[in-house]
Design a protein with these regions (language model features):
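A short, basic-hydrophobic beta/loop patch
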Residues: 162
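Catalytic palm active-site di-aspartate
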Residues: 132-136, 177, 181, 200-218
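Right-hand nucleic-acid polymerase module
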Residues: 1-71, 79-133, 138-154, 165-171, ...
Length: 342
């Protein structure tokens, strides 16, 4: 794609509009509008028709735009709304070209560069008390009008903002499986993050958020913070999941975003490491294929990647421990198709 400066873009725009016999006021207004977006390092999109043209939205079959399916999580299921490949491509364009220009709260640790479940949990290491909360139906609770406001605040027209929001939403809310949803949720939740942090700070409490997981910790008690959190969330359309309220007192291991926080350190749960160790043991003792046949595993095709993924996850949290598991996996005699030899 040809790279042109903002000044060149404005000149070309002005020339094109003059050729099409546009009036001076309209030309001036369009050039000023484009200039503001270019100064903000945003792509120029004038209205809904322009968004449709640039993103080639007519090529999308909107009747087949999403695939909705459940994913098992223990005894419960979570509904994923996955966009079709053509729609996902457009959403990724919005994610890379528009959404990085927005600021999010430093307390938001999910889906942000340099932040992770580890950095989220580390904030609370060494604290005696912790309260972990979960927002019910987080993405579906973020409505289309909130997404429109994101693009309006960026400087886009109402028409362009509505069209961009339409690409990012499903049934007038953020879908669980769209690549734009995590970043949009962090942008939209920024004000609430700041209010929650300020409320917690006044009480000497540390606050962080990873997607829909809210964590508060302190060296003292929590007081009535649960009620205060609900008071801040409810007017914005967010409700807490009452079944996922976890309070931890002194001397108790704290499970924060799936990790164990205890004695000032952050670790992967023992049961997670134990299961991986067990699978490695059986692969070495019986061979990979025999082990999979004995267990009736459905992970047959990507089993090697599955195990290495677990080891790299451990390595991200506990590098030295993760290295041990990676070395153990390297010692397994993988069949040719697992090792990429065919």
């Amino acid at each position: 794609m040809e790279h042109i400066t903002a000044q060149d873009y404005i000149k070309r725009l002005q020339t094109a509009m003059e050729r099409n016999s546009r009036g001076p006021r309209e030309i001036e207004a369009c050039c000023e509008y484009a200039g503001r977006l270019l100064d903000a390092r945003l792509p120029v999109l004038f209205d809904a028709a322009h968004v449709q043209s640039v993103l080639r939205l007519k090529e999308i079959d909107w009747n087949q735009a999403y695939h909705v399916f459940p994913i098992s999580q223990g005894v419960k299921t979570r509904t994923v709304t996955a966009p079709s490949l053509p729609l996902k491509t457009r959403q990724r364009w919005i994610l890379t070209e528009i959404l990085p220009r927005f600021e999010v709260s430093p307390r938001a640790h999910g889906f942000e560069p340099g932040r992770s479940i580890k950095t989220n949990a580390e904030l609370h290491a060494g604290h005696e008390y912790a309260l972990c909360l979960d927002i019910h139906d987080f993405f579906p609770s973020i409505r289309k009008e909130s997404v429109i406001r994101v693009f309006l605040e960026a400087g886009y027209s109402r028409g362009a903002s509505s069209a961009l929001a339409e690409v990012c939403c499903f049934k007038k809310a953020l879908p669980q499986g769209a690549p734009t949803s995590p970043r949009l949720s962090n942008i939209i939740f920024k004000e609430l993050d700041e209010r929650l942090e300020a409320m917690a700070k006044r009480r000497g409490i540390t606050y962080s958020r990873y997607a829909d997981d809210l964590t508060f910790s302190s060296h003292g008690g929590m007081g009535n913070i649960l009620r205060e959190v609900e008071r801040l969330l409810r007017p914005q359309g967010f409700l807490l999941n009452e079944e996922k309220v976890h309070f931890y007192g002194p001397g108790v291991p704290k499970r924060i975003t799936g990790l164990i926080v205890q004695n000032g350190s952050v670790r992967v749960p023992k049961e997670y490491k134990r299961r991986l160790k067990q699978e490695i043991y059986y692969c070495k003792k019986y061979g990979v294929l025999t082990h999979l046949e004995n267990t009736g595993s459905k992970k047959f095709v990507h089993y090697r990647e599955y195990l290495y993924g677990k080891a790299y996850y451990i390595h991200m949290i506990e590098p030295e421990v993760g290295n041990i598991y990676l070395e153990e996996l390297d010692q397994i005699r993988w069949p040719g198709f697992f090792a990429g030899e065919c």
